[in-house]
């Protein structure tokens, strides 16, 4: 078994299916390219190794574990493995009563995995390790890191009443912001960083990327979770995210199949309807899913949507349709990964079928995982009874459980299911990751219109500035960074805050403030899912903003719904920040005052005001206050060093091998191998560098540059490319071929 970065990557003599053959061909092409690069004397860019790995194919020992585990399961245990249940992400002591239901699911129901919600990275690790210790079969851990990356779940915690942020994972702008950037490099790093931080926190599988084409401006549930309204853009950026997540060591899930973008009902509260036939699906909704499957996406999540033009007026939702899951997805698109239902707690399913029957029908249709049934025992009992009644067979259940066990084995969970807290400290919310997130937010800011030429604003302009802010009362983080930054730039700015509780007196006071202003900044934090109507903006607010826009220099900033301006037709200067979190607030503020260039483009239309691709450019006109951003995402990720050329080994610190999970004794054996080679005259000298997880753990020199030269080798000795290519090309090629079972 070959090992890359301390992790096994394959088995000998593995069977060669069509997908595996394609992987091998790509590997051969990679090897050929590497040989060409080394021969030409140009080293390939150095990649930052992921702290966790996945094997490509199963070694014999892992395959044996899968089959023996399957054979040992009773019918009830087999069905239990199909269930993955939502759990709170916050810290709870294993001795607390709050831990008891979680423990019962794992110990008594023997569920296959858990999906933690909002918490902190250390709380994740503590809770997941405690549950893994109680599980007879290792748990597969999934999480919704779909919209904002790790920060969607392992950040966003604040201490009340002070609202002090508790820190956590890297928070990216929403997925649609990456559509506004349009650069695959950013989508790739979005996936890679999300995966690295997920794995460090104990999460194995991302419920991401969202592959829905958001071509309906009235969609209340997908919106900024999507890359955009262009299926080719969604496909391209989704594929880049998948590639990045693979490098980061996590599994990916494309969702929501066969598409949830062209809907106007939230499936959490009702059943959306997509009026598309097969030809329309092929030309729009299915394009990103087909590309993702070609890219090797590991899992697909279903959509709770009705498709009357495909399944008939009385047809079941896609989640419960064998025609969609087994016919369209498995047969037509040749998907052979794990198939998840969307959460079965959602009313689009439960209102009509109930938990038990919905679980049975989902498995009948072809689903491998029953996600978040809420009543775990009811779901398991219903599927067990359906099997005893002949609606399902044990073989059918084993096929699904085998897929899940293979995932766990590829992750090495049958050998070690636990995560070290040290992994959290090493990578979660690291400076490089935060810089990348800030850079993405900056690049995504989109200036949709600016008829009056108000953007960028001058901070020192001698006029009274009024900041009119609207957000839900429960959104305590709304405008925290924006308001603080605005006061830092315009100390005399006056803020007027409104929310859904504001009465006529509050609006009258706000109108007085606007009337006295020399210019008005309007920031609105309203997600599309708040409710129905014109972006859920109350009529008094719409009237106030439209009046301000006709009487005063007014700039509108949207921190959630990009479609907001449809309800405010009199606004001519409109900035879209895409997200409400602080990373987007800082970026919008910098754009507003010209501290950074504005280059974003709409990945969606805003009918009838703007089309896909619209967006005005603005140059940077003043020095940035926040300098954490970088111009190149590869620099932010540490993949490319722009600091200048350095002699290798110079200013390099050597870490303790134990800090990256390596053995000092093992390194000593490597030294002895080199010393033996020199004794046998296999070489006159050698330089050795060993690293793992971005840390150098050994840097040594042996012997002399030429026999009898008297010139010792040093760690900074410069070698000709012929000497380097022999080692790098041959060793890398051998490791790849061993990993693919060809050598």
Language-model regions: role of each:
Residues 86, 102-121, 207, 217, ...:
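Short acidic, glycine-rich surface-loop motifs adjacent to enzyme active sites
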Residues 75-81, 109-113, 135-139, 199-205, ...:
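Loop/turn elements at helix/coil->beta-strand transitions in domains of secreted/extracellular proteins
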Residues 16-29:
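Bacterial N-terminal signal peptides that target proteins for export
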Residues 74, 124-139, 143, 149-153, ...:
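Second-shell residues forming the walls of enzyme active-site clefts
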Residues 28-39:
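Bacterial N-terminal signal peptides
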Residues 655-721, 742-743:
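Short, conserved catalytic-motif segment at the N-terminal edge
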Residues 109, 121-140, 147, 182-200, ...:
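Active-site-adjacent structural elements in enzyme catalytic domains
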């Amino acid at each position: 078994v070959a090992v890359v970065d301390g992790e096994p990557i394959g088995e000998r003599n593995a069977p060669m299916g069509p997908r595996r053959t394609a992987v091998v061909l790509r590997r051969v092409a990679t090897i050929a390219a590497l040989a060409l690069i080394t021969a030409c004397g140009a080293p390939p860019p150095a990649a930052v190794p992921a702290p966790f790995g996945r094997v490509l194919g199963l070694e014999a020992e892992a395959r044996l574990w899968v089959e023996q585990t399957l054979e040992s399961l009773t019918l009830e245990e087999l069905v239990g493995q199909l269930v993955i249940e939502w759990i709170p992400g916050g810290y709870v002591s294993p001795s607390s009563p709050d831990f008891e239901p979680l423990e019962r699911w794992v110990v008594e129901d023997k569920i296959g995995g858990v999906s933690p919600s909002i918490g902190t990275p250390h709380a994740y690790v503590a809770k997941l390790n405690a549950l893994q210790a109680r599980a007879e079969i290792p748990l597969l851990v999934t999480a919704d890191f779909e919209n904002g990356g790790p920060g969607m779940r392992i950040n966003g915690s604040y201490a009340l009443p002070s609202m002090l942020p508790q820190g956590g994972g890297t928070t990216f702008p929403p997925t649609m912001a990456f559509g506004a950037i349009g650069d695959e490099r950013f989508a790739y790093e979005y996936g890679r960083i999300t995966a690295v931080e997920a794995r460090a926190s104990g999460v194995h599988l991302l419920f991401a990327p969202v592959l829905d084409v958001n071509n309906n401006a009235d969609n209340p549930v997908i919106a900024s979770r999507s890359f955009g309204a262009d299926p080719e853009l969604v496909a391209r950026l989704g594929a880049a995210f998948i590639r990045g997540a693979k490098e980061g060591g996590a599994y990916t899930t494309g969702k929501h199949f066969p598409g949830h973008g062209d809907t106007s009902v939230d499936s959490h509260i009702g059943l959306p309807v997509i009026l598309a036939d097969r030809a329309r699906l092929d030309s729009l909704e299915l394009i990103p899913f087909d590309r993702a499957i070609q890219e090797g996406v590991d899992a697909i999540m279903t959509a709770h949507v009705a498709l009357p033009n495909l399944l008939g007026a009385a047809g079941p939702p896609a989640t419960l349709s064998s025609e969609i899951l087994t016919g369209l997805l498995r047969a037509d698109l040749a998907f052979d990964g794990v198939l998840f239902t969307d959460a079965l707690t959602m009313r689009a399913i439960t209102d009509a079928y109930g938990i038990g029957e919905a679980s049975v029908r989902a498995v009948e249709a072809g689903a491998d995982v029953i996600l978040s049934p809420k009543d775990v025992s009811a779901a398991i009992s219903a599927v067990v009874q359906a099997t005893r009644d002949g609606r399902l067979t044990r073989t059918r259940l084993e096929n699904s459980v085998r897929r899940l066990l293979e995932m766990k084995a590829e992750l090495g969970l049958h050998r070690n299911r636990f995560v070290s807290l040290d992994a959290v400290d090493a990578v979660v919310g690291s400076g490089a990751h935060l810089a990348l997130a800030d850079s993405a937010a900056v690049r995504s800011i989109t200036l949709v219109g600016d008829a009056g030429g108000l953007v960028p604003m001058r901070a020192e302009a001698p006029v009274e500035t009024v900041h009119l802010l609207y957000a839900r009362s429960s959104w305590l983080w709304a405008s925290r960074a924006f308001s603080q930054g605005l006061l830092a730039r315009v100390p005399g700015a006056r803020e007027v805050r409104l929310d859904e509780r504001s009465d006529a007196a509050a609006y009258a006071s706000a109108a007085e403030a606007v009337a006295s202003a020399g210019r008005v900044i309007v920031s609105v934090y309203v997600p599309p899912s708040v409710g129905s109507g014109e972006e859920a903006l109350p009529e008094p607010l719409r009237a106030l903003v439209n009046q301000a826009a006709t009487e005063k220099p007014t700039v509108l900033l949207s921190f959630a719904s990009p479609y907001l301006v449809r309800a405010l037709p009199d606004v001519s200067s409109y900035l879209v920040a895409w997200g409400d979190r602080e990373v987007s607030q800082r970026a919008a503020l910098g754009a507003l005052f010209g501290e950074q260039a504005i280059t974003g483009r709409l990945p969606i239309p805003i009918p009838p005001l703007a089309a896909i691709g619209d967006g005005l450019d603005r140059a940077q006109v003043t020095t940035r206050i926040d300098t954490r951003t970088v111009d190149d995402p590869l620099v932010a990720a540490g993949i490319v060093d722009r600091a200048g050329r350095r002699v290798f080994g110079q200013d390099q610190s050597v870490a303790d091998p134990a800090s990256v999970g390596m053995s000092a004794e093992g390194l000593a054996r490597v030294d002895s191998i080199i010393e033996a080679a020199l004794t046998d005259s296999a070489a006159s000298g050698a330089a050795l560098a060993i690293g793992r997880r971005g840390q150098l753990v050994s840097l040594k020199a042996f012997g002399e540059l030429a026999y009898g030269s008297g010139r010792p080798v040093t760690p900074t000795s410069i070698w000709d490319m012929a000497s380097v290519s022999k080692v790098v090309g041959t060793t890398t090629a051998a490791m790849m071929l061993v990993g693919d079972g060809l050598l």
